[in-house]
């Protein structure tokens, strides 16, 4: 599901296993995210396996966020999860050098617009104690919805 708007060059394109090196580079450009989770940076073969698994799940969408020929992020979300009519953002990853430039906000705006009429609620999963991510989702009108701490918190917004 590719999303574009006339006011922006930001768009998405479906990610495939061929895009694993690009996604791996995005992961490498966001080391603080993995430090926050106390998780090792995924290897390229792990990224490839994750994309293969996503391709087998008809409800899961993996997309590259692109602008002016540059990959500026990665979005992984699942439709009709956890309930029918929900869409859950599992990962919105923007390289550290590009954070706070509006890419995340614009990406979620495009996602929400594309889901209207197909989903009634968008959820965002926030792993660990990621205060910055929580502030980001609150700033977009999301509210605390599901407590699965210490591992995960979910934030939600009705469409």
Model-found features: residue ranges?
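Conserved active-site alpha-helix within GNAT-family acetyltransferase domains
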Residues: 105, 128-146
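Glycine-rich phosphate-binding loop
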Residues: 102
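Terminal substrate-recognition subdomain of acyl/acetyltransferases
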Residues: 2, 153-159
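Conserved beta-strand-loop-alpha-helix junction that forms the acyl-donor binding cleft
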Residues: 99, 123-134, 150-152
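Acetyl-CoA-dependent GNAT
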Residues: 5-10, 14-20, 24-99, 108-114, ...
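Short secondary-structure boundary/hinge segments and terminal tails
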Residues: 45, 116, 132-133, 155
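Short aromatic/hydrophobic contact patches that present stacked aromatics
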Residues: 91-93, 123-125, 156
């Amino acid at each position: 599901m590719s999303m574009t708007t006339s006011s922006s060059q930001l768009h998405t394109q479906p990610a495939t296993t061929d895009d694993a090196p690009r996604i791996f580079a995005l992961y490498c450009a966001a080391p603080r995210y993995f430090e926050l989770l106390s998780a090792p940076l995924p290897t390229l073969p792990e990224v490839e396996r994750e994309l293969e698994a996503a391709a087998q799940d008809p409800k899961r969408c993996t997309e590259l966020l692109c602008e002016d020929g540059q990959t500026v992020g990665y979005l992984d979300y699942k439709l009709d999860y956890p309930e029918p009519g929900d869409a859950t953002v599992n990962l919105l990853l923007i390289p550290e050098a590009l954070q706070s430039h509006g890419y995340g906000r614009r990406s979620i705006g495009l996602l929400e617009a594309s889901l209207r009429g197909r989903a009634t609620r968008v959820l965002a999963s926030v792993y660990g104690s990621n205060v910055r991510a929580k502030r980001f989702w609150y700033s977009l009108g999301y509210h605390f919805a599901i407590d699965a701490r210490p591992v995960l918190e979910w934030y939600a917004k009705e469409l």
